Amino acid sequence: LQPERLKEESFVERLRELRPDLGIVVAFRMLPEVVWALPRLGTINLHGSLLPRYRGAAPIHWAIIRGEQETGVTTFRLKHELDTGDILLQARLPIAPEDNVGKIHDELMHLGAKTLLATVDLFLQDEAPKAQPQTDYDIAPTSAPKLTKENTELHWDRPASELHNQVRGLSPYPAAWCTLSFDGQEPMTFKVLETAVHSDALPSAEHPQGQLILGKHSLEIQTAEGRLEIKVLQPAGKKAMPASAFLNGLRSK
């Protein structure tokens, strides 16, 4: 079934005729209540975070951007408010210091599949499995809003460690970005895909915040705390490349 509109009466009527026992939602937009309330045992959702942390559209990205050392998946009963339903199962996954969102996404995809199957097994064993309200958890809810041009831009008035996490949390897609100017040339826009932190370098009169510092093979920016070395970047309209290759091309012009 693939309706043009989820509230389409012919679609809803067809679902009623199927008499579904359980609804399952994975990586899909909000369903209208007339759809998710229809299955006899309700509808469950798989979410890419340890709820109530990171409710919203981009939970995997924001967990890494915020420097979390652990994330996971949650299955829960669907209700009106986004990602607030009673929790059925959770599974945890560590985040290593250099993991990016691409790697964690792929690992959570497999973990999520296992957790979803285990959740369905709960309903096979008991048509009313225990589910815990999110308000019972001693954890403050946090949000994972939609990624935009504004919240993916790198700003040099932040510490290098935070910017590094932002790059990891957006790589390879949609990618953090910045605008840099080389030797007074027109500013260029880049996607930034891999970075390293040099935390001992503080702003100074010689290297103020936001200054570009070029080595023979390195490209660094002075931040509010430490320097951020850009190791892999992607100029607009070109393929991703090591910063050293970009610098070689820049100097050969």
Region spans (language model):
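One-carbon transfer enzymes
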Residues: 1-172, 186, 235-237, 242, ...
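An anion-binding loop in the catalytic cleft
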Residues: 151, 156-253
